[in-house]
Amino acid sequence: MTTLIKNIGLYRNGKVTENQNISLDGKYIKDFPENPKDEDYAEVIDGKGMLAMPGLVNTHTHVAMTLFRSYADDMELMDWLQNKIWPAEDHLDDDIVYWGSMLAFAEMIRGGTTAFCDMYMFMDSCAKAADKAGIRGNLARGLAGISPNAQSGLQENIELFEKWEGAGDGRFHVMLGPHAPYTCPPDYIRQVRDEAMKRGIPIHIHLSETKGEVENCLKEYGKTPIALMNDLGLFELPTLAAHCVHVTDEDIAIMQEKHVRVAHNPGSNLKLASGIAPVVKMRKAGITVGLGTDGASSNNKLDMFAEMRLASLIHKANTYDPFAITATEAMEMATVDGAKCLGYDDLGKLEKGALADIILVDRSGFHWHPRFDSVSLAVYAGNSMDVDTVIINGKTVMRHKEMTTIDTEKLYAEVDRVTEKLYAFSKK
């Protein structure tokens, strides 16, 4: 199907050009016609006054954890995990994860996120929800070598790959998801590595999120988590490492040499008091850094506009440098760099031949005036509620702030139902 998006401000190559048009052919961007005729297209979207941007890419999250939002707040990571989250997760099932995931996808699409990278459990249910929602995703089954389900979890992840890799007209890719060095002993990491190498599956892992994690790893193995994973050969596979808050110069050198990509989660890292990742130093070393929200239970929202703003502001403050992460750089981290983190070279940019993941942002609000610089406004003043229209893989999944793939009334009812089901354990 051919689509014309006309009369828009077009974000390309770090700047916005007004009164532009985009034509789509199926799931790809075809060109940028100067004088298009409406009758030549099957669908015409008039974006007058709006800003066309690449869809935002959430490089690290746990989508079904929307159902833990506000359940456990103001805690440090290990206390939060061990005493609240992990016990509650024992009560998850396919039904709960499906609707928790659908809630996340509604929130993502509403806020302009068109692609995500998830690590969780009951991932077949997550994939089914993502397919119904029409969103793009990289999927990984979270794996814990210390769990009684270590082997069955790995098998689930392999089956997820066999079923979903390349599915959804190319919208889905699958990764293996060893949770972290503190939940995955070396022998298990080697097993995951070997299974991934047999099939060419990339890796998604949490690394060096807290000081305590690094200190314990040094005490047990004499190496940082990143050095340990490198010695175990994990980085011989394409790897996306979430967090990387407490990393040494030697760690950064390893990551640069092995082309490890980083999912930076500023909101979650601040809320859990984990620290601030040395993103400026990593970017200067040539490491690709994307942005993520982490789960809604530790953020507590899936708002990539908020993450762009945070990523720019906290690194200015942390380095005493107003140029540390500019508005344009924050935008690139949330789009094209995020796409690279997920393994794409034809996503996250509005170029001929690129995948048509596009959002139209309403610039009519008070906070969009005066309009000296639309990139600056998007990052520092814009918010997720400004998003008007969302196109993923060439298909319109939200039009004028109305979902086309998700029945929101049914969604709210089902979320209430599965929330009651999930938390029944706390009433016993």
Question: Where do the language-model regions lie?
Answer:
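His/Asp/Glu-enriched, well-ordered alpha-helical/loop segment
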Residues: 231-234, 238, 280-365, 381-383
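Alpha-helical scaffold segments that flank or form the walls of functional sites
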Residues: 69-135, 156-167, 416-427
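Active-site microenvironment of metallo-dependent hydrolases
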Residues: 1-20, 24-25, 30, 35, ...
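Metal-coordinating catalytic core of metallo-dependent amide/deamination hydrolases
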Residues: 125-245, 250
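Helical hairpin unit composed of two closely spaced alpha helices linked by a short loop
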Residues: 271-273
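Divalent metal-coordination and catalytic microenvironments
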Residues: 8, 22, 27, 49, ...
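Active-site gating loops and adjacent loop-to-helix segments of metal-dependent hydrolytic enzymes
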Residues: 67-99, 106, 133-144, 211-238, ...
